[in-house]
Amino acid sequence: MPGLNLTRDEAIERASIIKRVHSYHIFLDLRTDQDVFASNVEIRFDAQEGASTFIDAITSSVKSINLNGEELSTDLADGERIQLPNLAAENVLKIEAEMFYTNTGEGLHRFVDPADGEIYLYSQFEVPDSRRVFPVFEQPDLKATFEFEVRVPSHWVVVSNQPEVKVEPKDCGCGRANTWYFKPTPRMSSYITAIVAGPYEKITSELTNSEGRVIPLGVYARKSLMPFVDAEDMFELTRQGFEFYEEQFKTPYPFEKYDQLFVPEFNAGAMENAGCVTYLETYVFRSKVAEALRERRAITVLHELAHMWFGDLVTMKWWNDLWLNESFAEFMSTLAAAENTRYAKEAWATFSASEKTWAYRQDQLSSTHPIVAEIRDLADVQVNFDGITYAKGASVLRQMVAWVGQENFMAALKVYFDKHSWGNTVLDDLLVELERTSGRDVRAWSAKWLETAGVNTLAVEVENDEAGNISSLGIRQSYAEGFETLRPHRAVIGLYNLVDGKLTRTDRIELDIDGELTVVEEAIGKKRPDLLLLNDEDLAYAKIRLDERSIETAIKHLGDIDSSVARGVVWGSLWDTVRDAQMPARKYVDLVLNNIGKETNSTALRTQINNLSATLHSFVAPEAREETRHRAADR
């Protein structure tokens, strides 16, 4: 329906009329009905005098509309929008309405726990669903403060973005009730506001941040689920994330508290509501699980925490930069895990086996698209919310951080947060700061990496002299048909040799790769290694082709490399090579059978077993399939 699908042009026009939204005061009565709830709002905003616009409100009914003391006809509401005619320079808008509960994870979701019959509510507003809970100018660049007042049954708790000011008991004629009053939020976008209500149980803790402020921490879950919640693990990861992000960003945590809530029937992994993060209950483990699942939960915890700065403190102007919001959090969460948690040895290997594998697969489909996509309306957001947005975006962001230098990247972020706190930005605002700190042409980099689709291939071309020393080493870059872009890459070449039964890195070369052929002068004269690993450390986003000698070494000795990241690069390279019909499938089978028993990263282990299955069923020549399957089964 047109009223539900806000277009970018409509948002731009409305933002030109609404000069500033000052505040929302929102009253919700969540006691009385299983289908609808009362939602009353008072909004103060400045506007172009005499102009008209609309406010978003997906309602069951509208009881009254009062604009600047004048009662307006409820006919101005059509169930999706409310028209606002003849605005003043300074406006006070009061609306009384009823809204629908949902069971779709949009707006205010209502769940009845089959274990005890208790009712649990939680909000989910990204992308455009705060309008299902209260009338609102539903676009990220119309920020305001939000003050919630919520009436609930007396045995419930209510959690929102800010701490509660008071809880006031009252007998309302239909049983005892409490009204929860919350402090106004800082200026922020409506999609990161939140209300969670019900007989949730909680475990509390606290931390002291870099400013010396005490930040209250909470972990919440349903009563029937709370015995399985590992709150101490959540608190440990949260403390490690706070420490890392505040140190790297040189910007203190911007909110007053940090609550994390496991909510039922959640249709996403998690949501970065400011100071009130929600997670799906799958992250509550009721029995022993694979380490990969625990690591995935850790990355999710750190991902949502990163959003408190990038996304919540500073927010995209429109949804076309949603990719940056998500890619940044995915990159930073892995970096935080690698540098400040118990997952230090495995974080980037897991990223390679999961995120980058997903990205490479998505980027070679006919449905691929540039990371920066045109978002003309809200419907476009869902179409482009995919493996390119998340996985390729994060992979390319890692490449960019390597290209500009991590210190320069973090220095740029410090200025970015200082300049734009509590405001909205576009991609160019970040690129400007990156160019200033790095001295690199980041806009040209952006045009090649963010505005075009497809993945390049980087192939090793190496020769040696009679003494076994490298006489020439080149990196040849190519592209797939239809995606004719050669891109700049920052990469590491690892020189690995067999030493005392281990395949050990004995030399390292870091370089820029650009154009069709990059000559590696630094390698000339070095002893040709047993394994010459292009993209060691996995900084580049590209398919890698190894030389034949390196392939043979990997088939026999991949499991003898200590670094799970280096192993992951080889696993990925040879999988791409066989999948592109550049290497016999039997060699990939040999690689897996010889080395899978030494793989310690559980995500890589799962990925390679899946790839082996695909190879045995699809890539091995039909006449050799039965024999090869028996050989695999016997191992």
Where are these regions (language model features)?
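Aromatic/His-enriched, Gly/Pro-containing loop or helix-boundary segments
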Residues: 71-87, 123-131, 281-300
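Ligand-binding face of N-terminal immunoglobulin V-set domains in extracellular IgSF glycoproteins
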Residues: 38-55
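Extended, low-hydrophobicity, Ser/Thr/Pro/Gly-biased non-transmembrane segments
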Residues: 3, 15, 98-206, 232, ...
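N-terminal, polar/Ser/Thr-rich
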Residues: 1-38, 114-120, 140, 442-447
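A surface-exposed beta-strand-loop module
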Residues: 57-114, 135-138, 175, 179, ...
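Hydrophobic alpha-helical and helix-loop surface patches within well-folded domains
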Residues: 182, 211-214, 218-482, 621-634
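Solvent-exposed beta-hairpin/edge-strand motifs
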Residues: 50-71, 490, 494-499
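Non-catalytic accessory/interaction domains
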Residues: 2, 149-152, 168, 223, ...
